[in-house]
């Protein structure tokens, strides 16, 4: 066996040992409570004011993943301008719920001052005095920080919220459950996409005069009545 071959062999063994040591020492990533394969990209979101096309993502979870967080936030939005790829939120509501007890620890309703006011003159005058999108986005970021977001047929709402945050440079880390999708999984009939209609099937009674906030209450009621997750 030649000397040069031995040298190359030793170098190869040392190199292999270094690689294996590096792999063993690599820290494992912490789970955020949602399976990686369920990451759903919300892509091609055209955001105002410059209509830049960006790729943004939210993590879609199963309802069973709710146990990984102490809270969940039920959200609903009112938008103008078409689908979530080019719309703007003009009103928003959410309730934050302690998962183990069902206690509502926070609730929020607000109009949102839009960027394209010239297109919204037909809307209520209260938009002129509404909080800016940045202020509302900061409020959402704080609410979402230790919670999973929930809604009924909620994908477009999630897309609109992410786009709003992007506009004002408030990047939102959203993990969400779509209650409509969860109901469809085990149901052979066509389900109504109106959360009020579905909740009333289970005996829901109106709790708020604000339609968006009442939709949040209806969604939360539906979740508990359907017994998706033991408390």
Residue ranges of model-derived segments:
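Short alpha-helix plus adjacent loop in nuclease-associated cores
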Residues: 176-197
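Active-site metal-coordination segments of metallo-dependent hydrolases
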Residues: 188, 207-214
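Conserved non-catalytic scaffold segment of RNase H-like nuclease domains
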Residues: 51-55, 59-166, 170, 196-204
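The feature marks non-catalytic terminal segments
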Residues: 224-231
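N-terminal accessory regions of nucleic-acid-interacting proteins
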Residues: 3-17, 21-73, 77
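Acidic, divalent-metal-coordinating active-site segment for phosphoryl/phosphodiester hydrolysis
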Residues: 211-224
